[in-house]
């Protein structure tokens, strides 16, 4: 089957990119590819059998027209000016059978006009982390970019030490970022901001294109998508680590996996990025930061959208987030209905977990073992303060009995929303260290395991982290 590519970005937004081709690595070789995703995108298996090829920037497929995008943004709350694709190149937009498109974005593809002081490269460590994280999030049901392939090489890339240069093929319906809009707003080119909005509406919100109120309705949906995404992050214990405006997806996708981390111990103020000295992007601050970023996006639209309309959309953020979050957290607790005491029970559990540094994922997963008419619970052994747990658990069982459903029904609900497996940093690190020694088996094993996060397992993928794997330091270095 021949793949078809279109050039919408190149044709319709001529001042938002620089056309250029990837710079190949030395002795590039394909070490992993996403068979399931490739099948979904109707990519012939033969493309993965002819060396690095397009996956390593050594060839282009017919119809591809590579370019690097320019955008700007606020980083750690401070205006950073022009940024852009410093090491990534959009190879093309694949046209799918249903008329939608999928960006093919090659990360680590070499120098671009937007590399600033960088070298345009990515290292094997960061490409493995992003591939694992994006696929883990996908199978958790959270909107995200996807990973299609990883190429390693003999080209050294210098970070803290010399590391193998690598490339990641990332795919997504769009790489539109808040930062695209900021770029032209701060250059006082509001008409180009409008062109970006029209482009987004035309291709991703086409049902609004002929509506006279399209900009307000569109921005309201961007707010809702963002609120929903953040609610989902919070419920699975995911910390992004670098929520700069240039890393915010207009479509509400999880974008740009860098120093991310999933909670091990329940620590509301968890900071996964060791460069985040002030804790701006801590786990519990993510909802507020996302709203702040939406406010920056709203500012760029103010020359052609009524400020009252923008503020009305922004005002809806909190309620949308709380609605999604509350619904999912009730499911995580096994509640089939909504009752007035639900929030208090959840907050009391969180307080107990925070005091005892309980494992976030294991605690919620073990709730499925609760029998509503039994005072015994395997979860009790997870807590030191048994009296405090017993007090909470008695009220929790009483709440379960209000729903009048069987233990098996409730267990099925809890296990469908509380994963047994999340991508803990130590699991990723183990796969990385093996891969850097030339052993790709753990990378493939872990990818396969992450496809079934809600299935029970009896291996160390679902255990607490070993001592060496606790609080691994992760930075923006990639």
UniProtKB/Swiss-Prot annotation:
Reactions that this protein is recorded to catalyse: L-seryl-[protein] + ATP = 3-O-(5'-adenylyl)-L-seryl-[protein] + diphosphate; L-threonyl-[protein] + ATP = 3-O-(5'-adenylyl)-L-threonyl-[protein] + diphosphate; L-tyrosyl-[protein] + ATP = O-(5'-adenylyl)-L-tyrosyl-[protein] + diphosphate; L-histidyl-[protein] + UTP = N(tele)-(5'-uridylyl)-L-histidyl-[protein] + diphosphate
E.C. number: 2.7.7.-, 2.7.7.108
Pfam families recorded: SelO
Keyword Metal-binding recorded: yes
Broad enzyme group: transferase
InterPro entries in the cross-refs: adnlytase_SelO, SelO
Domain of life: Bacteria
CC cofactor: Mg(2+); Mn(2+)
Binding site for Mg(2+): 247, 256
Active site (record annotation): 246 (proton acceptor)
UniProt-recorded Gene Ontology molecular function terms: AMPylase activity; ATP binding; magnesium ion binding
List of residues binding ATP: 84, 86-87, 107, 119-120, 170, 177, 256
Keywords assigned by UniProt, alphabetized: ATP-binding, Magnesium, Manganese, Metal-binding, Nucleotide-binding, Nucleotidyltransferase, Transferase
Reported function: Nucleotidyltransferase involved in the post-translational modification of proteins. It can catalyze the addition of adenosine monophosphate (AMP) or uridine monophosphate (UMP) to a protein, resulting in modifications known as AMPylation and UMPylation.
Family indicated by similarity: Belongs to the SELO family.
Protein name: Protein nucleotidyltransferase YdiU
Organism: Shigella boydii serotype 4 (strain Sb227)
